[in-house]
Structure formats: structure tokens, C-alpha cells
Amino acid sequence: MDSKTAKLIKSKNTAIEMILRRKLYSLGYRYRIHSADIPGKPDIVFSGKKIAVFCDSAFWHGQKYLAGEKFKTNNEFWERKIARNIERDAKVNNLLTQNGWRVLRFWDHEIKKDLDGCIKQIKSVHETQGN
């Protein structure tokens, strides 16, 4: 993948976000999406409960990189890019946590393979967090 191709990839309303959001909505949960006023612009936000949910691509957010998978081309560029993404995610997690938020991050493959498990985690936090 080159940087021109990368720019074409959606960052909002991705397939994995839509899968998770539709399931939550069908269960009666109401939320905001991509809230610009919250650090990291979480994919799903339960404002009153201070819960931020991120649907992370294993590629873009570094799971494959951390597992030692190499990039096919332009390895140095991608290593820097993914390392910055990982660092930014950690900063966002810390900032939100310091401000009383619960942060949930799900890998794309977790949402695809175990949607019910992801929902169960969200439900559990939703029931115990805040109001």
C-alpha cells in the first residue's frame, strides 16, 4: 500500500464501526459518533457515562506491526507511520482516562469474529460507569 492509496481509506463510518453501531442501536443504546470535542474523536461516545469506544484497524493501529509483521514496500515509512499512530493512541487513552473516561478499543477482527463479546464488554462498562 502506498501513501496515495492510504489517503483513500475511510477513517469514519467504516464497516467495522457500522457493524458495532447497528448492534448497539438495535439493543437500545444511544450514543454520539466522532465527537470532535473529545480527545481522539472516539468512534462511539456515551457522553453521560464518559465511555469512549474506538474501532481500530489492526493494520493502522499497529497490532500487526507489534506482532512483527513486515510491510511489503517502503518499510521505513510505514514503521514510522504506524509507530506514530500507536503513540497517539496511547496519549489519547491516557488523556481520556485522566479525565475520568473509560476507554474501550476493539480490533477490527474482534468486531468481525466476536461481535457479541465486544457488545458484552460495552454493556458491562456501561452498567458500572458513571450515572
Located regions from the model:
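Nucleic-acid endo/exonuclease domains
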Residues: M1-N131
